[in-house]
């Protein structure tokens, strides 16, 4: 049992109007996951046979469905704001040159905890549904090989 890889919680995940129930999720990014700014990076694991087909920032669907969704909080572990630009730019450039790298896109996330989207009051905006912008990153798995037209057994996967 590897506690750092355990999916400790379940949620319902909604994407383009489709609901994915009992999706496992956990925190990710080593010690940066506990940084004090309240933003967290997550890893979601979708259920067998119910994988979403995400699309890029241009609205084009990725070649394969994703079993995992890794998110980046877009803030460095030393408190610097990166907005995910370094990760996204690197991955885009690597893919453009024929070097396989994860697909990335930005998205906004909402965490529904109550009936009101943004409760009234001085602190209401911080108690509402809007969690913020995150960077979505494709996971290295068999679907990555298929999406990037790679042969199985090339040794890049753990």
Region annotations inferred by a language model:
Residues 1-158:
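Phosphate/dinucleotide-binding and metal-coordinating scaffold of catalytic cores
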């Amino acid at each position: 049992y590897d506690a750092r890889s355990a999916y400790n919680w379940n949620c319902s995940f909604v994407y383009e109007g489709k609901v994915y129930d009992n999706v496992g999720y956990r925190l990710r990014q080593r010690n940066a996951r506990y940084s004090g700014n309240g933003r967290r990076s997550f890893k979601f694991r979708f259920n067998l046979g119910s994988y979403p087909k995400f699309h890029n920032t241009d609205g084009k669907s990725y070649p394969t469905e994703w079993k995992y969704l890794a998110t980046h909080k877009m803030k460095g572990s030393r408190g610097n704001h990166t907005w995910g630009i370094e990760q996204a730019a690197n991955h885009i450039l690597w893919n453009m040159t024929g070097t396989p790298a994860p697909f990335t896109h930005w998205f906004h996330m909402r965490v529904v905890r109550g009936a009101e989207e943004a409760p009234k009051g001085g602190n209401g905006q911080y108690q509402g549904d809007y969690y913020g912008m995150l960077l979505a990153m494709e996971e290295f798995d068999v679907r990555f090989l298929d999406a990037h037209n790679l042969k199985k057994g090339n040794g890049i996967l753990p």
